[in-house]
Amino acid sequence: MAKLSLSSIFFVFPLLLCFFSPSSSSSDGLESYIVHVQRSHKPSLFSSHNNWHVSLLRSLPSSPQPATLLYSYSRAVHGFSARLSPIQTAALRRHPSVISVIPDQAREIHTTHTPAFLGFSQNSGLWSNSNYGEDVIVGVLDTGIWPEHPSFSDSGLGPIPSTWKGECEIGPDFPASSCNRKLIGARAFYRGYLTQRNGTKKHAAKESRSPRDTEGHGTHTASTAAGSVVANASLYQYARGTATGMASKARIAAYKICWTGGCYDSDILAAMDQAVADGVHVISLSVGASGSAPEYHTDSIAIGAFGATRHGIVVSCSAGNSGPNPETATNIAPWILTVGASTVDREFAANAITGDGKVFTGTSLYAGESLPDSQLSLVYSGDCGSRLCYPGKLNSSLVEGKIVLCDRGGNARVEKGSAVKLAGGAGMILANTAESGEELTADSHLVPATMVGAKAGDQIRDYIKTSDSPTAKISFLGTLIGPSPPSPRVAAFSSRGPNHLTPVILKPDVIAPGVNILAGWTGMVGPTDLDIDPRRVQFNIISGTSMSCPHVSGLAALLRKAHPDWSPAAIKSALVTTAYDVENSGEPIEDLATGKSSNSFIHGAGHVDPNKALNPGLVYDIEVKEYVAFLCAVGYEFPGILVFLQDPTLYDACETSKLRTAGDLNYPSFSVVFASTGEVVKYKRVVKNVGSNVDAVYEVGVKSPANVEIDVSPSKLAFSKEKSVLEYEVTFKSVVLGGGVGSVPGHEFGSIEWTDGEHVVKSPVAVQWGQGSVQSF
């Protein structure tokens, strides 16, 4: 990677309002930027960084509209966000105290049974050993929260932890009583959003400038991570049971950062900065970039997460929903816990039965009046005006009273059903295309509908094409729990590696339940989030890495309680090295996009195993100074690296903790890139014994990827009271025979395991040949 000096570094920041005009817009020539400044440059005459930032703006060249300060930052990051003219932006970039200036950008928002699926027990394991995460504070950065929801009841909880420094922002629709001993804090961050959206009233009817959740996403993620126990939870009797968050005794702090128009960097950073000041222990962020992950120094989430990690906060993020293409994972900085999505052993079965007697397995959450048991006429949407079933595009005369086969893609799945209903259709079969494969995602449709896989879709299209009078019916079977189909499996939508920024860091880290997850919902919109949906529900079932992230955030809270002395890196290590990569059938985890075995670029280390993570045996710990050394190893130089460091003295770590290569970062997984067929790559690792036996002896086991030889030295680690931390080195040798790099697959996979007879500490190994090559897998 090229050296990243000051001249090539741009940056991202946000925090406190000084002067703000919601009517300002891009028509005034101003744009929103995030500005990072050197903390140590603040003149002593200013009593606060906020005052200094105001002074900086006042010193800029004049423009028809004055520069407007949005936020000032001082905890997770240092700098401010502001509305600036082009001349003012250029002047700031030349200022000796400014490290970087980058445009404010928008990000996107990417359970009754999952605790049982994860193996939780009330009498043993992680729940009992952490007392359900009692008094750990989880900061949820999302669309806000619906405070009246029973998942946020504080029954049985003690006083608010004395370490909490936050507050509950009140408003016309968010009284002080909205917060309690469960929901201990709530704030809203909208200045960046309002300036970008021109302060219009376009979304005013639905939006609330308070922490109240008008969309549902934030309530869902918060209740998944740390919701209280709620009996008899369901969505129209689907998934009926007792709902509980992963850490049901943890406290929740809600930070509303997402609005109808997106989630803006300036607001995200303001919330992260505030969460650090408020005293959260875990940050859960189901938000990320659309498309490829930005470079670390222009990624506001990566920068804010670095600052949070410096304060000992675990930052758990969604990997994104851009699968199944490779190199789509976002939130991939090594100090972030990156989570992909998987299925659980619960189905909401709704089969499509065609007139020729064939039965196609499907899924649905439809809860209205069922179709008649008799067969109805069946048509393909592509023959009726709109293959993707866009609203208003279907020919009513061709679909009225019939079941319509619609193709997935282009618009929301529930919107397709709405389009069929508005055109007079009786029902819908929604067919996956090749991109989504056999992934089945249940939806609370407004019309009798089911989703089927790509193979079934192809067969039903052929049936329609070849039959003189095609017919079908839909049979709704409700909630089914069992071993068939096997689970977990990786969702087709789950974003994947390799890590396109730093290929030697394996991403995602793990996968967790993210398909058809039941959790709390807002009272503002229906389960489809469509304007025409009049229904209101307490719980909803939705899918995404947005759902898998809070599962892991909750697990991090439990581990934080069970092991209060563990660092964020140690908590990540415990989750990674105890993850599993087989289904409940004993076969390798399947990728639903292809129907083939998944791999470490798709599922990371594998599926989280909470109870094993409680006692991992060994952990790979990483201090902040080692992350600094990593940044230097990938090409960052002073003063540009100050975007992350804030404190110039930390730059010394580039020498005192120098890494031979970025791959030497003490990560709990291995990712190797061979540039040539005979290349040798060496990585060092350091492990700490956290088991009960201080004299444990671990021996190594290696599963080498094809075309690779692996040597681990030493092959035995003998710990003692005096030696609780030991080092080893791994040598990876490419042994490709003839033909060069092009003669082998672009990637292979294996593992390195350390075991003492009680613990198995497993690290995945991913190998690529030809740096920068993109493969399909």
From Swiss-Prot:
GO biological-process terms attached to the record: leaf senescence; proteolysis; secondary shoot formation
Keywords: Autocatalytic cleavage, Glycoprotein, Hydrolase, Protease, Secreted, Serine protease, Signal, Zymogen
Documented EC number(s): 3.4.21.-
Gene Ontology molecular-function annotations: serine-type endopeptidase activity
Pfam families listed in its UniProt record: fn3_6, Inhibitor_I9, PA, Peptidase_S8
Transmembrane segment boundaries: none
All copies of domain Peptidase S8, residue ranges: 115-614
Residues in PA domain copies: 376-461
Domain Inhibitor I9: 32-110
Biased composition (Basic and acidic residues): 205-218
Region of interest called Disordered, as start-end residue ranges on this chain: 199-223
UniProt key word Hydrolase: yes
Enzyme class, spelled out: hydrolase
Protein name (record): Subtilisin-like protease SBT1.4
Compartments reported by the entry: Secreted
GO cellular component: apoplast; cytosol; plant-type vacuole; secretory vesicle
Similarity comment: family membership: Belongs to the peptidase S8 family.
Origin: domain of life: Eukaryota
Active site: D142 (charge relay system), H217 (charge relay system), S546 (charge relay system)
Glycosylation sites: N198, N232, N395
Presence of the UniProt keyword Secreted in the record: yes
Organism: Arabidopsis thaliana (Mouse-ear cress)
